[in-house]
Every structure is written in C-alpha cells, then in structure tokens.
C-alpha cells in the first residue's frame, strides 16, 4: 500500500531567484543545503569531488527579454568550496524599447571559496541590460570569477549594458566598479573601447595571485587582482583568459 503522491515542485515564478547554498559539515563533507531553481536558471549537481561541490547553472528558458529580471543568490559556508559551471552563455535579445536586469548576490563565509567560470554574456542589438554583482567575503574567503561581455552578435553593433560590481572583504570595500556601456557612440571612442566589442576579465577576490606580471593586471587595494582584456574577436581572448584563470586557480589550490 502506498501513500499519496508527493506534491509536485512549484514552478518558478517570474521573479524567483535561483538559490545555491553549500556548506561543509563537521566531518569535512560538502553538502548542498539549498538548490532552488529560479525563473531562468536551475542549479544541477555535477559529479562530486572529494574537496568541493560542482554545480551547473542550466538555462531553463530563453532570455533575457524586455522586463526579465534574472536573480541569483549564492552562499558558501565556512570552509566550504564551490565550483559554479555554466554549460552555455546567455543572450540578451532585442528588447524593443524595454529593459531587463541580471542581479547576482554572493556571500562567502570565513575560509570558503567560490570558483565561477562564466560563459559569454551577449548583449544583442536592441537590448538594454542592467547587470549587478554584489559580493561579500568574510576573512579568509576567496573567489575567482571569469567574465566575458560581448556587445552584439556577429555583424551587430550591440545593445546597451551597464554593469556594476561591488565586493567587500572583511567589511571593507575591495572592488567597486561601474562600467557604463549604454551609449554606443561614447563607448566606441578611443580610450574607452574603441573598435573592440568584447570585454573579458579574470578577477581574484580575497587573495592576490602570485606569478609573472601581466601587462593588463591591476592589483586591488586589498587582497585581490584583476586582468581585463579587450578584443574585436573572441577566440584569442578566450584562450588567454582560460590559461590565466587556470594558472590563478592552481596558485589558489597551493595557497
């Protein structure tokens, strides 16, 4: 004899955030405390590793479109380690006069670590996106983030995007950036982006990676560093960012 069937999971509402929360128990085992799908992304566990959890952020619908509000909340508990994997990039399509938002909030507890290997974020012609990343790191917490912003699909000039990044370490500002690329005429000026339509970066927060100097590396006022590259095409930049990200990840493993 069986009981009543388990209730079906409630479908995500348009404003529901995707939630990923991981922790490490007293035995050292990593646990996913919460994996909640949102309106646009569903967290899916990958094959486990002994020293971390690996979670894929899988797209569940097309987007971004006008009026969309993608929200992501990630928390890493004390001493825990999380790898976020994006199987594919994200495209903001023609908004036809509207706007959309992409917002991520990251909280990393003492001794926690997050490695986020982001895939390209494409802002198609006609899109207008507000993109916000807020990161809070406790003492001893670390984050490695790879990010690629592409202005336009092939043959397009690209839409409008404004990205704001704010990171705090031990209660103090570590990185505050406001990158306003909403006016194509201004962003294409010499000294801004010029002819480049791809902006790629690797950012380390909570630690300052050692190793050979990079001509486009900026060391932050606290424990952190960033390398940012500009290009007209993606392959060469992606190869350089991949190599740099892997080097910094390896250095982080041995820190």
Swiss-Prot record:
UniProtKB keywords: Chaperone, Cytoplasm, Nickel insertion
Pfam families, A to Z: UreD (PF01774)
Subcellular location: Cytoplasm
Record bears the keyword Transport: no
GO cellular component, one term: cytoplasm
Gene Ontology terms for molecular function: nickel cation binding
The keyword DNA-binding is annotated on this UniProt entry: no
Top-rank lineage group of the source organism: Bacteria
InterPro entries: UreD
Coiled-coil regions listed: none
Entry function: Required for maturation of urease via the functional incorporation of the urease nickel metallocenter.
Family that this chain belongs to: Belongs to the UreD family.
Subunit annotation: UreD, UreF and UreG form a complex that acts as a GTP-hydrolysis-dependent molecular chaperone, activating the urease apoprotein by helping to assemble the nickel containing metallocenter of UreC. The UreE protein probably delivers the nickel.
Name the record gives this protein: Urease accessory protein UreD 1
Organism: Streptomyces griseus subsp. griseus (strain JCM 4626 / CBS 651.72 / NBRC 13350 / KCC S-0626 / ISP 5235)
Name of the gene encoding the protein in the UniProt record: ureD1
